[in-house]
Amino acid sequence: MDFELEPSLEELIKQDTLKWIFVGGKGGVGKTTTSSSIAVQLALQHPNDEFLLISTDPAHNLSDAFCQKFGKDARKVEGLSNLSCMEIDPEAAMSDLQQQAQQYNNDPNDPLKSIMNDMTGSIPGIDEALSFMEVLKHIKNQKVNESDDSKDKISYRTIIFDTAPTGHTLRFLQLPSTLQKLLGKFQQLSGKLGPMMSMLGGGGQGQQDMFAKLNEVQKNVEEVNEQFTNPDLTTFVCVCISEFLSLYETERMIQELMSYQMDVNSIVVNQLLFADDDENPCKRCVARWKMQKKYLDQMAELYEDYHLVKMPLLGSEIRGVENLKKFSKFLIKPYDPKVDRGIITDLKEQ
């Protein structure tokens, strides 16, 4: 490389075209704090635009991060009027799906209904699928004008995803491509499936409604799949800590993301001690910082063409809008332990 990329997310925050930002990594590395910080900085840097932060992790933490209760519908963040949050609940989505299946046909002997109930209860990764469908539904509702020909007319400038731990996230991101292929095959079979269902006693208006709904879902999935693989519209921010297992997981995730043709060029490293600049560092801190530096050096070598953002370990939890504002500024302006050390003890207890 002839140049070194800035160790910050300033370029990402200021980019005009991004519609989707995914934030993911191993469990316990600070994904929610990082995604919340990115969302806060986007809202601060672009006060005339609306932003949405969505948690797709079944163990939701957004409410804790902002000290404010969120649910399955987008709700404004108190103290930051152009940022909204929502937490997708796969169990509630599962219940809604089964109720919708019952509305199509009340006949308990209908084989199609039996198949649908079995599928919704036993498909591996159904949580991710339902989360994805909830996202699709929300995006459709956000279209400014359904008659507008432009695909990208969504009222939120950017949607940020606080994702589940790595395995769930990778399955979630694989869904657009998988569903696109599956629905395409299902559509090919639908012509033959219709008469067969009629012979078995199913079919009728309910079946037609289901096929119409599948057509609509397929169009939405195709649109999202196009956007997820467009680096101008979508990017993924990896979050890790400076330890072997986290570094290994990050590399595995980056390789998977590249296989999905998804843009990834930013890594946030959390919980760094910067013990070299402590006046009276404890032996444990010095030993741990030595280990962290070893893996930081490996990351710098391995990811020289990535934005590698180094975030400090603070003395208290990062909760509430004001604390997130203070912490998130280091995503834009790299943390300097000689100048910024006050932040470690400056946060207000929530």
From Swiss-Prot:
GO terms for biological process: tail-anchored membrane protein insertion into ER membrane. Coiled coil: none annotated. The keyword Zinc applies. Its main location: cytoplasm. One of its GO terms (cellular component) is Golgi apparatus. Signal peptide: none annotated. Its EC number is 3.6.-.-. Keywords: ATP-binding, Cytoplasm, Endoplasmic reticulum, Golgi apparatus, Hydrolase, Metal-binding, Nucleotide-binding, Transport, Zinc. It is found in: Cytoplasm; Endoplasmic reticulum; Golgi apparatus. Transmembrane segments: none annotated. CDD domains: ArsA. It comes from the Eukaryota. It is an enzyme of class 3 (hydrolase). The keyword Nucleotide-binding applies. Zn(2+) binds at C282, C285. ATP binds at K26, G27, G28, V29, G30, K31, T32, T33, E243, N270. The active site is at D57. Pfam families: ArsA_ATPase. ATPase required for the post-translational delivery of tail-anchored (TA) proteins to the endoplasmic reticulum. Recognizes and selectively binds the transmembrane domain of TA proteins in the cytosol. This complex then targets to the endoplasmic reticulum by membrane-bound receptors GET1 and GET2, where the tail-anchored protein is released for insertion. This process is regulated by ATP binding and hydrolysis. ATP binding drives the homodimer towards the closed dimer state, facilitating recognition of newly synthesized TA membrane proteins. ATP hydrolysis is required for insertion. HAMAP family: Asna1_Get3 (MF_03112). Homodimer. Component of the Golgi to ER traffic (GET) complex, which is composed of GET1, GET2 and GET3. Within the complex, GET1 and GET2 form a heterotetramer which is stabilized by phosphatidylinositol binding and which binds to the GET3 homodimer. Interacts with the chloride channel protein GEF1. Belongs to the arsA ATPase family. PANTHER family: ARSENICAL PUMP-DRIVING ATPASE ARSENITE-TRANSLOCATING ATPASE, ATPASE GET3. This is ATPase GET3. The gene is GET3.
